Amino acid sequence: MSPIENSDSAAWRELEAVRAEAAALRRQLADSPDRTRELEARIDSLTIRNTKLMDTLKEARQQLVALREEVDRLGQPPSGYGILIGVYDDQTVDVFTSGRKMRLTCSPNIDTSTLSYGQTVRLNEALTVVEANEYDAVGEIGTLREILDDGRRALVVGHADEERVVWLAGPLAKVAEEDDLDDPDSPVRKLRPGDSLLVDTKAGFAFERIPKAEVEDLVLEEVPDVDYSDIGGLGRQIEQIRDAVELPFLHKDLFREYELRPPKGVLLYGPPGCGKTLIAKAVANSLAKKIAEARGEDAKEAKSFFLNIKGPELLNKFVGETERHIRIIFQRAREKASEGTPVIVFFDEMDSIFRTRGSGVSSDVETTVVPQLLSEIDGVEGLENVIVIGASNREDMIDPAILRPGRLDVKIKIERPDAESAQDIFSKYLTEDLPLHADDLAEFGGDKAACVRAMIERVVDRMYAESEDNRFLEVTYANGDKEVLYFKDFNSGAMIQNIVDRAKKYAIKSVLETGSPGLRIQHLYDSIVDEFSENEDLPNTTNPDDWARISGKKGERIVYIRTLVTGKNASASRAIDTESNTGQYL
């Protein structure tokens, strides 16, 4: 082949190669967008994986830090606690800890000016104060005897009557820095002898006052709203107690002029339900109003205090507790009386706690309780505005030393109401304001006053009639004599109120059943029958003579009782001699 042909052949080959390369470039150029998108997608995927790896690494690092902190926390030495008892300007404090008094350094993070005596503080292993906490909320209970002159310390009595002087912590201690200690909102001024305090005897601090229901429930301070006009059938007894109580308070100058000593106390005795407690409350109310009038003050703003002592609840199984409660009661009375306010200390069921010494069957508590009361009553001699009133239905069981002149000077018997007194009592509950039945009103020409008076007269005649239906008991005396007692012999103001309430309930039921409103005399008659029949089973006692004494029947000893009730639910008469159930007293 000629050189020219060879040259052409090489050129053609080179041209074909160029064409092939151009075609390849064209194909690559055509495929480049797809490749770019593929690479971008891969980059996005790698970015997401990288982000997840970074989050995982960060979380692992945080867990590692938390675990390291937990390891460090678990490896810390234990902290101690103490009670702050002193603060100094050089960032040091006195702390009572582990039974020792120590002077320690405070952490720079603690502002010592904000610390208070008695506050709990936390200590590190180097005994440095690193944290201030609250005051102790648990501890022993002590009884406040008195607050010392500096106002920051108090004398408290602990177990076994052990006396101890303690600091007043927290809000109690702040009062010492105040100028006006008579501020009624001051915590210390609210403290009074007999209060229970939370005490740490080792550190010597009292933290707060703890209300104890056992004492607060025994002494109920109140201003009674009972007036003499609310009491019926006891005009003579009210006059007696007004002479004994109100005259010495209202006319002190005359008593001093005649050298007459006011009575220290009054005993109200008589059967249950006859108004002894009502009279005592009315005395406190009336006395406050009279003194307010004498001072030129508004009678509506008159103040008096009626300390109602629940006799049986005063008893306590622990030795010395009952006597302590009695001391608290009279301390409270002296406190109130020192303000110039009349104070009535009323002991209800006095025979339950102040029995004749030596008469106890299972205990001899009265041998110490009675002398405690005697000393307190004698202590009232130099104290104004206080009088003791006792109430009992077994005055024969009260220790004679309490009843002697000079202690409970005045003794007033609250007897069961007679027919006239019963009418007076009924008039307190049956008034013209009550809705009366049209038929009963028509009998008196629509005169409500006349209708009410007639109702009262008829119901009293029914109650006090010595009829067969009103026979209650046949008693046999030790000498063999027998006597029939009627329901009128056991009537009381409480029974009269119950009869009227029963009649009102019958009137309400009558309205609901018949639609005819108003109280009728028949409702009262039905109430009397039901009241009498319910009392049939009440004189159940192992000792008929004791039951008779409580019920107000005195005289010859009773050895046998037989019921004679013939009401609508009664059957044959029933003898009562040695019943096992004591039952409720009339």
UniProtKB/Swiss-Prot annotation:
Q: Which GO terms describe its biological process?
A: modification-dependent protein catabolic process; proteasomal protein catabolic process
Task: Give yes or no: UniProt keyword Coiled coil.
Answer: yes
- Biological pathway: Protein degradation; proteasomal Pup-dependent pathway
> Superkingdom of the source?
Bacteria
The record lists ATP as bound by G273, C274, G275, K276, T277, L278
**Would the keyword Chaperone turn up in this protein's UniProt record?**
yes
- Residue ranges of the region described as Docks into pockets in the proteasome alpha-ring: 585-586
The entry's cellular-component GO terms read: proteasome complex
Alphabetically, the GO molecular function entries are: ATP binding; ATP hydrolysis activity
Output the InterPro entries linked to this UniProt entry. AAA+_ATPase, AAA_ATPase_domain, ATPase_AAA_core, ATPase_AAA_CS, NA-bd_OB-fold, P-loop_NTPase, Prot_ATP_ID_OB_2nd, Prot_ATP_ID_OB_N
Key words, A-Z: ATP-binding, Chaperone, Coiled coil, Nucleotide-binding, Proteasome
Q: Which Pfam families match?
A: AAA, Prot_ATP_ID_OB_C, Prot_ATP_ID_OB_N
| Coiled coil (residue ranges) | 11-76
Functional description taken from the UniProt entry: ATPase which is responsible for recognizing, binding, unfolding and translocation of pupylated proteins into the bacterial 20S proteasome core particle. May be essential for opening the gate of the 20S proteasome via an interaction with its C-terminus, thereby allowing substrate entry and access to the site of proteolysis. Thus, the C-termini of the proteasomal ATPase may function like a 'key in a lock' to induce gate opening and therefore regulate proteolysis.
Record remark on domains: Consists of three main regions, an N-terminal coiled-coil domain that binds to protein Pup and functions as a docking station, an interdomain involved in ARC hexamerization, and a C-terminal ATPase domain of the AAA type.
Give the UniProt family note. Belongs to the AAA ATPase family.
Assembly and oligomerization:
Homohexamer. Assembles into a hexameric ring structure that caps the 20S proteasome core. Strongly interacts with the prokaryotic ubiquitin-like protein Pup through a hydrophobic interface; the interacting region of ARC lies in its N-terminal coiled-coil domain. There is one Pup binding site per ARC hexamer ring. Upon ATP-binding, the C-terminus of ARC interacts with the alpha-rings of the proteasome core, possibly by binding to the intersubunit pockets.
What protein name is recorded for this chain? Proteasome-associated ATPase
Species the sequence originates in: Nocardia farcinica (strain IFM 10152)
The organism's taxonomic lineage, starting at the top = Bacteria, Bacillati, Actinomycetota, Actinomycetes, Mycobacteriales
